[in-house]
């Protein structure tokens, strides 16, 4: 089954690579319209998925990731329309020039070909990935989690209907709807057909893909994100940033999980933090210093060492007091996932040092980690957030779904 999907996807990719920007935008507009027109069928499938997931004991954080609402689906359709408005990178000449040999050389951006994506309980990924791949002339094979198989199937049917209406092969966007896990291992070895693989899920999925895939893999999306409250931080805006980074949508990978507090500000900062977190419903997981300093009003529990390496994806926040900037940077290097980290400070020398020494895909000064997102970065919907350094890093927009080819123009030109 998968080989036939691969053959069809590869054939579709050749056709997609030749489309003009106008032709690609036309199909994206059609997809957005169909998502809204077929909203009832998609939401009905999603309700079944959510009910099944709840019966299977999925956490509230996972249920939030899984659930679609009319507003969320409308936002997804609007994201597709925003992709239409983005500049098409395909065909762009990156650089080049006339060589001494007389050969005119240029480096031109081209589609990757076929992209494979394996993801878990995130139904929005189906549309986000499909829209970005189509905009860049790539075919895509999707393998969503069993928790979302009804939603994904309904969504892909809508996308394929739009493709067909625009005279494009339905195989440009395909989904593996069989929940058999052995198919994941089979997909990981489809290097004959798939040019790049992107896993979006937990650490176990990323480890499996890194170890078993014969396809180049882009990993990321696991966000043990930190905020360091420096000794010179302005407390009022710092609290506002922390509340946003923790509570706006706790189930996302760019949510802060560990707060590092400089010891020189801890005595003044921790009590007001506790009050603010109590109002926001956040449970604090405190180290020994925090446990001794606070006795309410926020719910406070002792921090377990292993929690420093985990994504809570919930209204829980580690709070650790550090001696200085060195301690904060060392902690992030040991426990971070190179996703998103921030410093809150009034000292621009310290800000510059933090930016230079923290090796993460996104580093912020006096801003929330929640900005690490393709839409927020002006990239449109993202295919993933890469925490590695090759071939892409951070939110992966359109350019991350392209490669380049060298093109030489001559006039009977030969090498001397």
Curated annotation (Swiss-Prot):
Q: Give the principal location in a single coarse category.
A: cytoplasm
Name the domain of life this protein comes from.
Answer: Bacteria
Which InterPro entries does the UniProt record give?
Answer: Ald_DH/histidinol_DH, Ald_DH_C, Ald_DH_N, Aldehyde_DH_dom, G-glutamylP_reductase_CS, Glu-5-SA_DH, GPR_dom
- Enzyme Commission numbers on file: 1.2.1.41
What keywords are annotated for this sequence in UniProt?
Amino-acid biosynthesis, Cytoplasm, NADP, Oxidoreductase, Proline biosynthesis
Signal peptide coordinates? none
- Molecular function (Gene Ontology), one example: NADP binding
Q: Which Gene3D superfamilies match?
A: Aldehyde Dehydrogenase, Chain A, domain 1, Aldehyde Dehydrogenase, Chain A, domain 2
Pathway it works in? Amino-acid biosynthesis; L-proline biosynthesis; L-glutamate 5-semialdehyde from L-glutamate: step 2/2
One GO CC annotation: cytoplasm
Q: Give a short account of what the protein does.
A: Catalyzes the NADPH-dependent reduction of L-glutamate 5-phosphate into L-glutamate 5-semialdehyde and phosphate. The product spontaneously undergoes cyclization to form 1-pyrroline-5-carboxylate.
Name under which the protein is recorded: Gamma-glutamyl phosphate reductase
Source organism (scientific name): Salmonella schwarzengrund (strain CVM19633)
